[in-house]
């Protein structure tokens, strides 16, 4: 049995006096039995290195201890962890290496009674060969020098290894969790997020995304929220073919803090760079982190020019508050593991701590938008835009594009912002996903949407949103095999399933007439947060599409109820607005008016107000519809969808109500470049697509322009991937029949009427438009 040496150690809030056998925390003695204490000394002596079970047995237990060794070791480890306040499942100090041994995670400061005698690894050559070997190893060991100051003794540290091998602009990097030996939980997760913000300012460096890290952890058999220790991060690095792992550390030395950063090649373990900085106070830690991040960027190959251009200090780029940054970083982690909705309270907390935290507002707005709460999204993105000067360049791109998407609605400006963003940060997936998901579809540029969606997936194969936006563009183009293949790529080996995936499966099944597939998708959504109400609304639309309005109303109410139970009032209002619209299209005017007004009392978001105004106009309430149209024009003067889709369609219906079909046709001219687009109202509530086309067709009918009317309704039938289950897709058959009847072509008219009546063969018999259709068809016989 070999007794550990007599040096003293300091780590975090703890001190160890080997000679007296004392463990102190902030000067107070902690009781620890002899065996756990000697175990601690061995681990400290080998900090950063795996100490095998065999070595522990040889050094602490009797050589002939075999039977009781395992249980004795477990007891000693447990008692030691209890003394340090450590946990096996989420270790700060002692990491269990299955079937091998243990490792002390925190770099330990080894001290002696003489300030002239320096730390382990810098002693005279007479030191044991084992120490020299440890010095040459790749372990994360800090050498601490004793330095005398007038005001007292302060400790500074440096890394043992030196070397510089540059990264290329094609390399990716994995960021490990910081080792926090201070005992202060405010640094847990916070410094990693802060470093990520600093490094993501670089157009040169590219960090592996959190989505890809989580996916890789699953393939490793680890939980998605597993701690990224140096060893785990190295395996993630190897599995993702990344170039390097960045390991960080923060330690307290008296009242000061020491930060370190080291980059290793994950394949060879070669050290690329090592940086260190000291912070005199807790409040200076973020500034110190900014310093080492900037140094690291230049030393691994980034040009000084780009570092100087894109290098906003962390306190200015995010927040000077560690507590706010802690809430923000935790929110991002929660969003990854449990969804955007679960992260909302933490993001709100971050903005409460720092009311000028621009990116916290931006993420809060994005999270609200993802759950269909556009009003709250707009409010928070507006605040982010107000404080955008307190953000890095990359974050400002995000905030500016989000502002144009969610506040002004000016998609031309959003497109320009995303294009410059993608040029400046060519490996950032977000501008491509914005273009593919929210800009090109509204313009009707679905092929461009596919192109940008593919880029998104290529840049990050584990980014679920990338597959989602690509799938939507394939559906718009009715490339259903490509859409299904994209979903399969996401859900197969990568296991990337989000609520959108179920909705997309339902839409594909609907377009194929696959009732069993629709039922499977709907069943998978039952009880799923964020999916059940959405799919219930899809089911309501499908029922309305075939004329089963009574069943559709029941399903629509269920969708709204589920949304309200989840505190999503705006989503509930959207579903109610959609129901009012299909009632209005079918001529059930009193009910449509009631439901529309009720929806507007719940929420007055842009899309709800448009849908309500449209339903009221169809139902003959021109006065109230005009009031809402004026309000839309006042509130959204720059909004692309409002200016070139919503208002032209509304004004055209109002003109028809006044018996002015020619004026209606003229008013709709401005909508022509955008009319085949998927408007924002169709993203969550599935209404509004091709409404300008439908209204123009009605105007052509009213103007007795039969051929032109038929051409408009044929556009709707030719673009089922855009309309999907909106009831105008079924009603277009009827309107086409009316156009052919007006032209005198009874044969084509009969065919069109038959197509409509086949879709509505089991429809509710008392629907006004259904009764009209049957009478009109009878006259053609």
PLM feature spans:
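DNA-binding patch around the recognition helix
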Residues: 2-10, 31, 43-48, 64-126
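Acidic, proline/glycine-rich low-complexity intrinsically disordered segments
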Residues: 7, 17, 22-24, 28-31, ...
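Position-specific recognition of the canonical hydrophobic site in helix A of tetratricopeptide repeat
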Residues: 335, 369, 405-406, 440-441, ...
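Beta-propeller blade termini and top-face loops
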Residues: 505-508, 515, 520-530, 539-545, ...
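The N-cap/first-turn positions of alpha helices
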Residues: 36-39, 80
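Helix-coil-helix junctions within alpha-helical repeat/solenoid scaffolds
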Residues: 534-726, 731-759, 769-780
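Inter-repeat boundary and helix-capping residues of tandem alpha-helical solenoids
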Residues: 67, 318-321, 354-356, 390-395, ...
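Structural signal of TPR/SEL1 helical repeats
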Residues: 331, 365, 401, 436-437, ...
